[in-house]
From Swiss-Prot:
Record GO biological process: symbiont-mediated suppression of host cytoplasmic pattern recognition receptor signaling pathway via inhibition of IKBKE activity; symbiont-mediated suppression of host type I interferon-mediated signaling pathway
Protein keywords: Host cytoplasm, Host nucleus, Host-virus interaction, Inhibition of host IKBKE by virus, Inhibition of host innate immune response by virus, Inhibition of host RLR pathway by virus, Viral immunoevasion
Record carries keyword Mitochondrion: no
Protein's UniProt name: Non-structural protein ORF4b
Function text: Plays a role in the inhibition of host innate immunity by inhibiting the interaction between host IKBKE and MAVS. In turn, this inhibition prevents the production of host interferon beta. Additionally, may also interfere with host antiviral response within the nucleus.
Main localization, broad class: host cell
This protein's encoding gene: ORF4b
Signal peptide: none
Source taxonomy: Viruses, Riboviria, Orthornavirae, Pisuviricota, Pisoniviricetes
């Protein structure tokens, strides 16, 4: 009888142990991404053959499997708009300009000269038209090839009209005379754009000042605000008109020295004009 009781006790103990193993395995089979933490406690069976289990706290152990080539996550960037791009230009170092004969008499500027003298402003004595501003920082820059540009500028008759203030400089706008094709059939009134294109083709970096073709007449930088407004108002009272043929092409260093108010050219190339200025052009004024 005692043997039977002992066998029953052993069987019951093994049955309780099997139930314990099944309960643990059932928790493991719920989710492979869940594991037991240190907070889960399983009490061994007591002498009374009862098993007590405490609730287990699950923590995530999911790992991200990344490919070696995708070590860094991809980032999304907003598209770039054209307005977001800023083109940085180098400051110009030299000025390529057209100059006129010293004997040229600007008779239609006489009234303007007298009015500016009342404001203690002197007209410039270095009349020129800026053809292009270029960036050439090399100290030994050679401008000898500009000699081949002069034939293109031959017989380029310029018309000056309409006063305006650009920045704080009194200027007059310049353009090729549109009626010159009737006199010279080989002209197309596109000399200035072709000359600028010639500079680009020969490797010169052109600085875009976004200013129209003009000729500076007087500097108004030192005037008080009231006198500056009065000088700027002269543009509405005077409407001079002049014609001139450039006699030479000059290269001047920006900020270079001057003699008697005239910039010292680094290079000067004469323009051999065939067309002679004729008096009847004044009848168009």
């Amino acid at each position: 009888m005692s043997i039977v009781l002992r066998l029953l006790s052993v069987l019951k103990h093994q049955q309780n142990k099997m139930q314990l193993d099944l309960s643990v395995n059932s928790y493991k089979l719920l989710d492979y991404s869940m594991e037991w933490s240190s907070d889960s406690v399983v009490l061994p069976p007591t002498s009374s053959d009862k098993t007590v289990m405490m609730p287990a706290k699950a923590t995530s152990s999911r790992k991200r499997h990344r490919k070696p080539k995708l070590q860094y996550a991809k980032r999304r960037f907003s598209p770039v708009n054209p307005n977001d791009l800023v083109l940085v230009q180098q400051e110009p170092t030299h000025c390529v300009r057209l100059v006129f004969p010293l004997s040229k008499r600007w008779i239609h500027f006489d009234g303007l000269v007298y009015s500016l003298a009342r404001l203690n402003v002197s007209m410039t004595v270095d009349y020129h038209v800026t053809l292009a501003l270029i960036y050439a920082p090399e100290a030994g820059e050679c401008f000898g090839n500009f000699l081949h540009l002069c034939p293109l500028l031959k017989d380029c008759l310029l018309e000056f009209k309409k006063l305006c203030v650009l920045g704080k400089t009194l200027t007059i706008l310049a353009s090729e005379w549109p009626f010159f094709t009737d006199v010279k059939k080989n002209k197309d009134n596109l000399t200035v754009p072709k000359a600028v294109e010639w500079l680009k083709e020969h490797g010169y970096e052109i600085y875009n000042s976004q200013l129209p073709l003009h000729m500076s007449l007087a500097k108004l930088h030192d005037l008080p605000q009231a006198q500056f407004a009065e000088a700027a108002g002269l543009c509405h009272y005077f409407d001079p008109r002049e014609f001139a043929l450039p006699c030479a092409l000059e290269v001047v260093k920006i900020g270079g020295g001057k003699v008697n108010g005239r910039s010292i050219p680094l290079a000067r190339f004469p323009i051999n004009n065939e067309f002679k200025f004729i008096p009847y052009l004044y009848q168009c004024v």
